[in-house]
A protein has these predicted regions:
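Internal alpha-helical transmembrane segments of multi-pass membrane proteins
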Residues: 153-171
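Membrane-interface helix-boundary motifs at transmembrane edges
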Residues: 68-79, 151-157
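Transmembrane alpha-helices
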Residues: 9-71
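Interfacial helix-loop-helix junctions of multi-pass membrane proteins
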Residues: 102, 174-204
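Aromatic-anchored segments of alpha-helical transmembrane domains
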Residues: 27-37, 89-94, 165-177
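Membrane-interface interhelical connector segments
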Residues: 102-129
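Hydrophobic alpha-helical transmembrane segments
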Residues: 133-147
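N-terminal signal-anchor transmembrane alpha helix
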Residues: 77-101
Length: 205
């Protein structure tokens, strides 16, 4: 009597570089849409249609077609990225809210939320629809930033998180002041950098 032994292939300890890179690029598509809207001076809804929507569709397609031996790790990275993005966004917004609530600065960094919404809905920035759309886009950005980092750098030294935060901060400093209609100031830098630094301690698996 012959007993056949089935060998279970070992699970990969990391995703293929191409898979990680594509996942990260797709996750950053909402941020890329925002940057395109600002730089090209086009409505956010238009930039999102050509950048974010294809990126989201590609991410979903990657999720369901990733190689079987990578599926478990991919889903773990997906869950970790969503959690990291949520925690980082809460920390970022919480620090900004505290600084501005205590009147430590006169700048209102949250006005960007309504401008996001107005760019997506075409409605006035004071409407409830614009506010809801703006917060939704802000949350999507936060999730996307968390996902991109986890897919590329999960488990790496904390220096990677610092470098990633500095890159995001650099883009914000370059794009936001002119787009929001105020000049670069020490107050804006204080709020932005302090809030961004608070995201570096977010636990990432």
């Amino acid at each position: 009597m012959t007993i056949q032994m089935t060998t279970v292939p070992p699970k990969p300890s990391s995703l293929r570089p191409a898979v990680a890179a594509i996942a990260a690029a797709c996750a950053l598509s909402s941020g890329a849409a925002l940057a395109a809207a600002i730089v090209l001076d086009r409505p956010l809804w238009l930039a999102s249609s050509f950048v974010f929507v294809p990126g989201f569709v590609a991410f979903v397609a990657l999720t369901v077609t990733v190689r079987r031996d990578e599926q478990e790790l991919f889903l773990l990275r997906l869950k970790a990225g969503l959690v990291a993005g949520a925690l980082a966004t809460l920390a970022y917004d919480g620090i900004r809210w505290i600084i501005e609530r205590l009147d430590l600065v006169s700048v209102n960094s949250f006005q960007a939320i309504r401008i996001f919404g107005a760019g997506l809905t075409g409605a006035g920035a004071t409407g409830n629809a614009a506010l809801a759309a703006g917060w939704a886009f802000h949350a999507i950005n936060g999730f996307g930033f968390g996902l991109a980092y986890v897919f590329v750098a999960a488990g790496r030294r904390w220096g990677w998180a610092v470098a990633y935060a500095l890159v995001l901060e650099s883009f914000m400093i370059m794009l936001y002041p002119g787009w929001l209609g105020f000049s670069m100031s020490g107050e804006f830098l204080t709020v932005s950098i302090t809030a961004q630094n608070s995201t570096e301690s977010t636990p990432i698996t």
